[in-house]
A protein has these predicted regions:
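Short hydrophobic targeting helices and cationic amphipathic motifs
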Residues: 6-8, 15, 29, 35, ...
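Short, low-complexity, charge-dense intrinsically disordered segments
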Residues: 19-31
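A transmembrane-helix-recognition feature enriched in membrane-embedded lipid enzymes
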Residues: 47-109, 158-162, 260
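Catalytic core of membrane glycerolipid acyltransferases/transacylases, capturing the structured
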Residues: 70-83, 102-104, 117-173
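A cross-family acyltransferase "interaction/gating" segment
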Residues: 157, 205-284, 300
Length: 303
């Protein structure tokens, strides 16, 4: 839910969305907008009704323009990695994602990061924002498990395919077995594989229930699991949900990110886990560990 707004749509996004505001300045019906034809209108409304005006309007558009250039540059850079080694690919992807975070003025803070590079581990993290993948890849380059719909996104889908992303149809249980086999092969080749067991994004103040299916791959491959806990803070070092991709569309999520003066993403590396027991037991243990870390609320961090 966007601060200051409720979005309602009777017949879906293609038919338009009625937007209401709940603050005094924009009370009542603002208008009926077609999100497909006029996504820019949504961005303007969010801009004028967001509480944080610290980032100039031109700075926001500058960040968006630089991200567009970054995206097309990334497509070219990834094409050159076809014959690269795992180490070379990891180094390049780490650099690519660090550049994206820099453009968006996102500070990456890692805690308890292993001194040696991880190889052949299953990386598991809570999912909050579009920035999660950039943050994780900058620190721990991995192939990602993503929803099948992402493969159809313009440009981004192409980048994801070239980055060895494995796409999954969660409605097809047979597809889960195929994905687990693919993960096992990647782990055996010394590649890291990352997935978000919540299966969707949360606000970031807690975690959603984990799905157990893909934990089977670590058991079958005999690979260790690296749990990661992600938390976001604003320029005042207060916990924030603004970067969250939960319940908003891509345009609004990206606009909220570029509108923040500065973002801090804290990535806590929890102790490596050797899977023991069945996938349900493994899931429960990892879920509890990440949940405890994400649930640590600090209004103001120590300097």
């Amino acid at each position: 839910m966007i601060e200051g707004f409720y979005f309602f749509s009777g017949r879906g996004m293609d038919s338009g969305t009625t937007v209401y505001a709940k603050n005094r300045k924009t009370s009542g019906l603002i208008g009926r907008l077609n999100l497909v034809s006029h996504p820019f209108c949504i961005l303007l409304i969010v801009h004028f009704c967001m509480k944080d005006y610290s980032t100039p309007f031109l700075t926001r558009f500058s960040r968006l323009f630089k991200m567009l250039l970054w995206l097309f540059s990334t497509v070219r850079r990834i094409r050159r990695l076809d014959k690269a080694s795992v180490e070379q690919r990891n180094a390049e992807f780490s650099a690519i994602c660090a550049e994206a975070l820099s453009i968006l003025n996102v500070r990456l803070i890692a805690s308890n990061r292993p001194s040696e590079s991880l190889k052949g581990v299953l990386v598991v993290a809570n999912h909050i924002s579009l920035l999660d993948i950039f943050a994780i890849t900058a620190l721990c380059p991995s192939s990602f498990i993503a929803m099948k719909e992402l493969s159809r996104w313009p440009v981004i889908g192409r980048v994801a395919r070239n980055a060895d992303t494995v796409f999954i149809d969660r409605s097809n249980r047979k597809d889960i077995n195929i994905i687990n086999e693919a993960i096992c092969r990647s782990l055996a080749e010394g590649k890291n594989v990352c997935f978000f067991p919540e299966a969707r994004t949360s606000s970031g103040n807690g975690i959603l229930p984990f799905k157990e299916a893909l934990f089977q791959s670590a058991i079958d491959a005999g690979s260790e699991i690296q749990p990661l806990a992600l938390r976001y803070f604003d320029s005042q070092k207060r916990r924030t949900t603004q970067p969250s991709f939960s319940e908003v569309n891509l345009f609004v999520s990206l606009w909220r990110i570029v509108s923040m003066q500065e973002i801090e993403v804290h990535v806590d590396f929890l102790p490596l886990e050797k899977p023991q027991g069945d996938r349900y037991e493994v899931k429960d243990k990892i879920e509890a560990a990440i949940g405890r870390e994400v649930g640590k609320i600090h209004e103001v961090l120590a300097e």
